[in-house]
């Protein structure tokens, strides 16, 4: 039995010096496997007298159990250490600083539209909306632009077929409002419009805000005062404003509105092409034909209308020189307007 005690001591020492689970497995096979040292000792029982076999067999089983117990304990220690290391690697260190969440903000075009709407609703205008897919009648015919009219060449239109198109302005909303509502009418019509044009100052899709007022005894002075006050409030400064005679099929008389350049205060710069003036919108008195086709008597009621591009006003207010920047979805650009 001295040989048995020596094998157990060797096994326990080997287990103690094992460096990992793979080493423990090799030790198990060496001592407890089918051809292991302790297994071979068990096979020698047949060489012993019958009366000694039970006692020796019991001693061998105790030795095997002892080695197995130490192996399992050592293996459990390795597994626990491995699990602890894995959990430590995967845990979240709550003492580290957080990544932080940047707050979002409204898009500059949305800000501009809200600013325009806020002014006009404050002075009694309502907000009107209409379809972006429009018919030819409301986009052109009802606005005094018949099929043969040369003004149609001013609109690079996206047509679906001969009668349906993407609206080129929000004026059809004014027509639909006049068809369904009797004067007095005071509305602004913000929305997306579409024209086949793309460069640093034009986009195939852009936002337009048009306004309409129809009532008795309305004249150009009312229009002029409304626009001058709007520009003063929108740009938050006193600006010189001028009205240049122009032509639109749906207004008569018509005018282009220029204001003092916000970049150079009228001194002349690259933005205003050294003129000191910037064009900001078109306007005019509603043409009698437009009122008549909408079911309103032009002898009793008069009206004025105006239209402006939201992108154009945003470019001037924020000093942006390329309209396409508004639609590039570049967070570095948009973050400036939070």
Swiss-Prot record:
It catalyses: tRNA(Phe) + L-phenylalanine + ATP = L-phenylalanyl-tRNA(Phe) + AMP + diphosphate + H(+). Binds 2 magnesium ions per tetramer. It is an enzyme of class 6 (ligase). CDD domains: PheRS_alpha_core. The keyword Kinase does not apply. Its EC number is 6.1.1.20. Belongs to the class-II aminoacyl-tRNA synthetase family. Phe-tRNA synthetase alpha subunit type 1 subfamily. GO terms for cellular component: cytoplasm. InterPro entries: aa-tRNA-synth_II (IPR006195), aa-tRNA-synth_II/BPL/LPL (IPR045864), Phe-tRNA-synth_IIc_asu (IPR004529), Phe-tRNA_ligase_II_N (IPR004188), Phe_tRNA_ligase_alpha1_bac (IPR022911), Phenylalanyl-tRNA_Synthase (IPR002319), tRNA-bd_arm (IPR010978). GO terms for molecular function: ATP binding; magnesium ion binding; phenylalanine-tRNA ligase activity; tRNA binding. This is Phenylalanine--tRNA ligase alpha subunit. Mg(2+) binds at residue 252. Its main location: cytoplasm. It is found in: Cytoplasm. The lineage of its organism: Bacteria, Pseudomonadati, Pseudomonadota, Gammaproteobacteria, Pseudomonadales. GO terms for biological process: phenylalanyl-tRNA aminoacylation. It comes from Pseudomonas fluorescens (strain ATCC BAA-477 / NRRL B-23932 / Pf-5).
């Amino acid at each position: 039995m001295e040989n048995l005690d020596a094998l157990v001591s060797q096994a326990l020492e080997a287990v103690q010096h094992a460096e990992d689970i793979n080493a423990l497995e090799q030790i198990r096979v060496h001592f407890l496997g089918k051809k292991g040292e302790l297994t071979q000792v068990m096979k020698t029982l047949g060489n012993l007298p019958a009366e000694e076999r039970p006692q020796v067999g019991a001693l061998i089983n105790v030795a095997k159990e002892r080695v197995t117990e130490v192996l399992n304990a050592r293996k459990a220690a390795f597994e626990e250490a491995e699990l602890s290391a894995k959990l430590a690697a995967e845990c979240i260190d709550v003492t580290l600083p957080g990544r932080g969440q940047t707050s979002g903000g409204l898009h500059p075009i949305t800000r501009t539209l809200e600013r325009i709407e806020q002014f006009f609703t404050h002075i009694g205008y309502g907000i009107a909306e209409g379809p972006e897919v429009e018919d030819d009648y409301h986009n052109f015919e009802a606005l005094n632009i018949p099929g043969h009219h040369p003004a149609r060449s001013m609109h690079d239109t996206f047509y679906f077929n001969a009668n349906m198109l993407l609206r080129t302005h929000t004026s059809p909303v004014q027509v639909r409002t006049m068809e369904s509502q009797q004067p007095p009418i005071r509305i602004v019509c913000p929305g997306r419009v579409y024209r086949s044009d793309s460069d640093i100052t034009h986009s195939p899709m852009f936002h337009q805000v048009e306004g309409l007022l129809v009532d008795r005894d309305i004249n150009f002075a009312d229009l002029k005062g409304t626009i001058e006050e709007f520009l003063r409030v929108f740009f938050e400064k006193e600006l010189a404003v001028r009205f240049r005679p122009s032509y639109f099929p749906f207004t008569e008389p018509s005018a282009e509105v220029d204001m003092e350049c916000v970049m150079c205060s009228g001194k002349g710069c690259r933005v205003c092409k050294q003129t000191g003036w910037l064009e900001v919108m078109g306007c005019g008195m509603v043409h009698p034909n437009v009122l008549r086709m909408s079911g309103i008597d032009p002898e009793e009621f008069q009206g004025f209308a105006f239209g402006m591009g939201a992108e154009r006003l945003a470019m001037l207010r924020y000093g942006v020189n390329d309209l396409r920047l508004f639609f590039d979805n570049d967070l570095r650009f948009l973050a400036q307007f939070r």
